[in-house]
């Protein structure tokens, strides 16, 4: 954002000359201060930025803490102009460290864990860096930056101006900006909480030669540019302070200027109307008299502030004493109360323990009774199950007996039926066999009769023939005797074969007929005996005939 003040806008040569004249006049009136480098009109009033145009080349941790800070989001958001931001710096800034005191716990940590390069855990970002980023959001012009670094009211305004240059300007231009201020002897305390006082010149030499600034880093300077800066700093050693009256006078002047520039001006956060704003056109019309008047007013105001601070200190001391007594009394009361409470707690604990023991005993009794009841119920259930099993067994046995009896009855009935059937079959078979045996015996008698008749007839015929043939030769008788012997040999073999066939038939019949009576056997034997007798008779008859 551009500055809204009409006095600081414009790029004409007369305005530059007027600003330079006003700066020289203020330096003459206020004592030895910083010398302003010449600003040529050819450079223009627009100040280009170097590096990242959104982050101002700040450490990401610091930038995120700035953007999330309520101070930056609420209070600094209301400041719209360059002069309002300068007044805020005058009243609020007391150091130029990036973090407030005690907000970052880095004790005992080293390296990257210690947050030396800004990568550790964040803390409360300082007011100075919030205002520095607010200046960056305003997009300052060259004239406004020169007004910051040559400001006479507060060294912290100048320090933030130099820091703005270090973060936003090219490394090749840093020497041109800082060269005329390297011997500036104005003091300021740069550390949060105090304890690190240095001059503006020492701070600028640190900006040019070191990258680290407390727990953050400046933008890196290229190696050739850094070597050039180091050589030029060697040619510009630090000046020794003057001795004698001139040194004393200069020290007195610096003391007066430090008092007038001290940031702890007033308890109110608003800007004092008596304080000069900056080296601008407001001081062109006034002279040394107006500046002296402002100095007198400032001294008076500082004296009143000191008195008010001393009163406040006295009040604080008295309050601290009263608070100490009150604390002691309250501590004694608290001790008494704590003792009584501890006693009450002990009594309550005892009562609670007793009640717990009683409850536990009751619970144990309940558990015992419950276990007993459950045991009795289990025994009853077991007895019931045993009785049921016995009943089931008895029922099963009865059913098995009935089933067996039924089976036996059925088998007996079946056996009776089978026996009756077998008897019927045996009777029918015996009848058939008897009938067959009778028919066979009849046939055998008939055959035997016919055979006997035939034999008798043959015997008669043979006897006749024998008688007729006896007269024949004895040779024929021999042949006949041989033939008869052969016949006799053949006849028993035939009988044996017949017997074998009959025995086979009998065995076959026995296999097929399992239940035959003895009557059948007797019949067979009789028939066989009859047949044998008939055969024997035939053989005898043959022998007799022979």
Curated annotation (Swiss-Prot):
Functional summary from the UniProt entry: May be required for pre-mRNA splicing.
Compositional bias ranges of the Basic and acidic residues kind: 243-255, 291-327, 345-421, 451-468, 480-495, 511-546
Biological process, per Gene Ontology: mRNA processing; RNA splicing
InterPro entries, sorted: PRP38
Protein family: Belongs to the PRP38 family.
Domain of life according to the entry: Eukaryota
Protein's recorded name: Pre-mRNA-splicing factor 38B
Coiled coil: 292-321
Region (Disordered): 1-40, 229-546
Organism: Homo sapiens
Biased composition (Polar residues): 1-14
Location, primary (coarse class): nucleus
Modified-residue entries (Phosphoserine), positions: 5, 288, 290, 318, 320, 448, 473, 475, 481, 527, 529, 534
